[in-house]
Every structure is written in C-alpha cells, then in structure tokens.
Curated annotation (Swiss-Prot):
F(1)F(0) ATP synthase produces ATP from ADP in the presence of a proton or sodium gradient. F-type ATPases consist of two structural domains, F(1) containing the extramembraneous catalytic core and F(0) containing the membrane proton channel, linked together by a central stalk and a peripheral stalk. During catalysis, ATP synthesis in the catalytic domain of F(1) is coupled via a rotary mechanism of the central stalk subunits to proton translocation. The keyword Membrane applies. This is ATP synthase subunit b. It comes from Dehalococcoides mccartyi (strain ATCC BAA-2100 / JCM 16839 / KCTC 5957 / BAV1). PANTHER family: ATP SYNTHASE SUBUNIT B, ATP SYNTHASE SUBUNIT B', CHLOROPLASTIC. Belongs to the ATPase B chain family. The chain crosses the membrane at residues 11-31. InterPro entries: ATP_synth_B-like_membr_sf, ATP_synth_b/b'su_bac/chlpt, ATP_synth_F0_bsu_bac, ATP_synthase_B_chain.
Length: 169
C-alpha cells in the first residue's frame, strides 16, 4: 500500500471511487439501460409487426389483382358469348328475311303468271270469237257470190280490212 501512496493514490479515496462507480453503473443499469433496451425491444416489435402487416397488405393486393384479372377474363368471355349470340341472332334474322323475300317474290311471280295466263286466255278467246265471226261473214259472202280467183282475193282482202277495223274499235 505504501507503493500506491508513493504513486499518489489514496486508497480510501480509490475505494470510494470504485464504490461510487459501481453504484453509478447499477443506477444506470436500472434507470437507463433497462428502459433503453425495453424501448429498443418495443421498437423492434413494432417494426416486425409493421413488416408483417406490409406483407399481408402485399398478399391482399396480389389476391385482389388476381381476382380482378379473373373477373376481367370472365367478363371478356361473357362479352364474347354475347357477341356470338348477337351475330347468330343477326344471321338468323337475315336468313329469315331472305326466305320471306324469296317466298314473297315467288308469290308475286305466281300471281303474275296467273294474270298473264288469264289475259292470254281472254285474248285467245276474243281472237277465236273474232275469227269465228270473220269465218261466218266470209262463208256468208261466199254463198252470196260465186267465186273466181279475183273475187276470192277481193273477198279475203275485204274480210281482212273489216277485221282490222274491228280491232281498232
């Protein structure tokens, strides 16, 4: 101890300083180190929870995006089906309109043919009547006259003139 005194170290003062330093360390440990560690642990826990929440939000966003893509795909398929149905319906309507137009055209042709046949039959009947009348007239004139070639030709010419006059009337 004397050697320590020769060095200028006071032993009671040195022991007091060691005790004081120990007390200071104890107090710092109790009042500073533990609360700081608790705050650091709390902060670490909050960061971990925040990271977990971030991961959950990312997963939810990814699920929502997948759901959105799925719904868009379904909507696209439904839209395609609607378009296909509309095209099919349009084709059916167009085909029905074509068939109706064909049927109407055939009916009109049939009516026109019937009318033409009737008019032709009427004209033929009228010509037969006129021819019969002309034949009767010619026969009557033949009976009234004796026919030589010139008289015969004159008779034919007069009958034809009379027939054209009748047609004009």
């Amino acid at each position: 101890m004397e050697k320590l005194a020769e060095l200028g170290i006071n032993i009671p003062s040195f022991i007091a300083q060691i005790v004081n330093f120990g007390l200071l360390l104890g107090l710092l440990y109790l009042f500073a180190y533990k609360p700081i560690l608790a705050k650091l642990d709390e902060r670490s826990t909050r960061i971990k929870e925040s990271m977990e929440r971030t991961d959950q939000v990312k997963e939810q966003a990814q699920k929502a995006e997948e759901e959105f893509k799925k719904k868009i795909g379904e909507a696209s398929q439904q839209g395609q089906l609607v378009i296909e149905r509309a095209v099919k319906t349009g084709d059916e309507i167009r085909q029905k309109a074509i068939e109706e137009a064909k049927a109407e055209a055939e009916a009109m042709l049939s009516r026109a043919r019937t009318e033409i046949r009737q008019e032709r039959d009427e004209v033929v009947d009228q010509l037969r009547k006129e021819f019969a009348e002309l034949t009767i007239l010619a026969a009557g004139k033949v009976i009234d006259q004796s026919l030589d070639k010139k008289a015969h030709q004159a008779l034919i010419d007069s009958v034809l003139e009379n027939s054209t006059d009748l047609r004009k009337n």
